[in-house]
Amino acid sequence: MAGAKEIRSKIASVQNTQKITKAMEMVAASKMRKSQDRMAASRPYADTMRKVIGHLANGNLEYKHPYLEERDVKRVGYLVVSTDRGLCGGLNINLFKKLLADMKAWSDKGVQCDLAMIGSKGVSFFSSVGGNVVAQVTGMGDNPSLSELIGPVKVMLQAYDEGRLDKLYIVSNKFINTMSQVPTITQLLPLPASEDDELKRKTWDYLYEPDPKALLDTLLRRYVESQVYQGVVENLASEQAARMVSMKAATDNGGSLIKELQLVYNKARQASITQELTEIVGGASAV
């Protein structure tokens, strides 16, 4: 019965692992709902900022802010939003693959790339594959605040202000639903014109009080910050959804493995009983 004992031990081990993955699935489901609430709460502000900025990009401005002007592209920057923890399926690696493809496209044109990392998984990945990481922040937890994210954002905006960057993108996962999270690369600077057909058909003229430069300086920075924060909370909701799905798959796979091991155990036990009966019958016949 040595084989049967070993199989029983494996079954017990898988059952213990199954309890852990089930608990992690339930925790991820709870955190996902909270993340979705935060995402829904911040989305109206981010969407409204995007519309206001879209009006500005299509407008006839008396003061042309540097964030609204296209430049010859020599260096681009990416604000990369990844997770701090693993066990969330291919969420991070799919994002990194898309980013690497975009970086290669720029590199083929002779354009250099800078990276500002949000999340430890991005830091560790680009430490191994290589990349010019100029800023990073990790360990933000499940309820990040804008003050925790502002470091990398300031670094990239300063580089853009000083002419060391000519384009700035945010790279994150867009939350569609529990089963779908899409890696996206969105241009932040220079400010892209709105894709809204209604805005394209209109000409917008603005009067600024008291000073257009001061107003636009503040407004455009708030726009970048709002888009980065929205990207982070959507990525967090995507992380919890991906982890919940991964842990459910692990729990289900554990159940299938237990059934297979139970079948092997039953066969081994049956073979052992048959062997014992054969030995008893053989001994009786000898007597």
UniProtKB/Swiss-Prot annotation:
It holds the Pfam family ATP-synt. Keywords: ATP synthesis, Cell inner membrane, Cell membrane, CF(1), Hydrogen ion transport, Ion transport, Membrane, Transport. Belongs to the ATPase gamma chain family. The keyword Transcription does not apply. This is ATP synthase gamma chain. It is a peripheral membrane protein. GO terms for molecular function: ATP binding; proton-transporting ATP synthase activity, rotational mechanism. One of its GO terms (biological process) is proton motive force-driven plasma membrane ATP synthesis. It comes from Citrobacter koseri (strain ATCC BAA-895 / CDC 4225-83 / SGSC4696). The lineage of its organism: Bacteria, Pseudomonadati, Pseudomonadota, Gammaproteobacteria, Enterobacterales. It is found in: Cell inner membrane. F-type ATPases have 2 components, CF(1) - the catalytic core - and CF(0) - the membrane proton channel. CF(1) has five subunits: alpha(3), beta(3), gamma(1), delta(1), epsilon(1). CF(0) has three main subunits: a, b and c. PROSITE patterns: ATPASE_GAMMA. GO terms for cellular component: plasma membrane; proton-transporting ATP synthase complex. PANTHER family: ATP SYNTHASE GAMMA CHAIN, ATP SYNTHASE SUBUNIT GAMMA, MITOCHONDRIAL. Produces ATP from ADP in the presence of a proton gradient across the membrane. The gamma chain is believed to be important in regulating ATPase activity and the flow of protons through the CF(0) complex. It comes from the Bacteria. The keyword Protein biosynthesis does not apply. Its main location: membrane.
